[in-house]
Amino acid sequence: MKLIFSQTITLANAQPIKVTLGEDTQVLDEVVVTALGIKRATKALSYNVQEVKGDELTAVKDANFMNSLSGKVAGVQINSGATGAGGATRVVMRGMKSLTKDNNALYVIDGVPIFNTGKSGGEGLFGEMGGSDAVADLNPDDIASISMMTGPSAAALYGSAAANGVVLITTKKGQTEKTTITVSNSTTFSKAYIMPDMQNRYGTSSGLFSWGELANRRYNPSDFFETGSNVINSVALSTGNTKNQTYLSASTTNSGGILPNNSYNRYNFTARNTTHFLNDKLTLDIGAQYIVQNNKNMVSQGQYYNPLPSLYLFPRGDNFDEIRLYERYNTNYGYMEQYWPYGDASLSLQNPYWIQNRINR
């Protein structure tokens, strides 16, 4: 490789020429946030750090902003929960590290590790209902950046809890000598994308290996699903001077899943104030968040409490509209009971509409 620098100079009176290369300084270092909000150049770190700016999270908003990281960070797997709107998300860095323990990364918000209690629902016959997680409660418009930290050195910063990596979240502060009011809205819709291709020509029979009579009805499992929606509204105020900066925000998240009666609603209120004392030698940074969250009817991942097995195994040729009225009055006992005339009355399957309206509260 050759580096060639050329410059033409007119000689006068054959005087001696002194050649000096001019200085051209360019900033090539990328600065990222490490532990406790300390900023360091990427090349100065002994561990891998990848950063995602907050603007990348708000291009297409999700009820759980962690889903917006999918495909944006190399070597990081974002596993979205199958529990419906607002479901928990698992972050796995550089592959699975344990067969028996949790492989999820540690979450750190503004230097403070948080206890993430999210669950995606159990497996097996009686798998329980899934839920949301603590980090999903954050307002994506309040996030300045997210840094992904992996390697043993990252674990040394936060202890054994960070053995699977660290998701370091830095929230926004007030601006200096500038006042900004930001109002945003994000509205998205979702539908079931791929459905199983089933035959509707023949119905069922009493035998295991024979077709039934010609079916006179067509049943499509997609009739059970609905059009999901996710609406996020946010307003933020950022102001301040060289000594004091203030950030205030409020947001609402209203999300409906593609399954009946599945919803996720969240309301965020954030306040943060940063004050500098003693010629910027002392900084007082105070922040508070008030969050109200309510999720309803997240999908169970087992068989007995999951509406999907009974939906896909519904007998071909039978009238699916009959089970939409999922409860019937039992005159012998004097109360409403589930209507599901299929199976052997043991712990097998249940009416999918009854599950979504009576079990998964």
Where are these regions (language model features)?
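Short, acidic, small-residue-rich periplasmic hinge/interaction motif at the N-terminus
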Residues: 2-6, 12-58, 66, 110
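Acidic, small-polar-rich N-terminal luminal/periplasmic segments of exported/outer-membrane proteins
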Residues: 4, 31-39, 72, 87, ...
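Short, glycine-/polar-rich solvent-exposed loops and beta-turns at beta-strand/coil boundaries
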Residues: 10-15, 79-87, 158-163, 262-265, ...
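Membrane-embedded beta-strand positions in outer-membrane beta-barrel channels/transporters
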Residues: 18, 90-92, 166-168, 232-234, ...
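Flexible glycine-/small-residue-rich
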Residues: 21-23, 35-37, 80, 91-97, ...
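Transmembrane beta-barrel domains of outer membrane proteins
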Residues: 25, 170-172, 236-240, 249, ...
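Residues embedded in well-ordered regular secondary structure
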Residues: 42, 48-51, 72-75, 84-89, ...
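Non-catalytic regulatory/gating segments with a bias toward low-complexity or hydrophobic composition
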Residues: 69, 76, 111, 146, ...
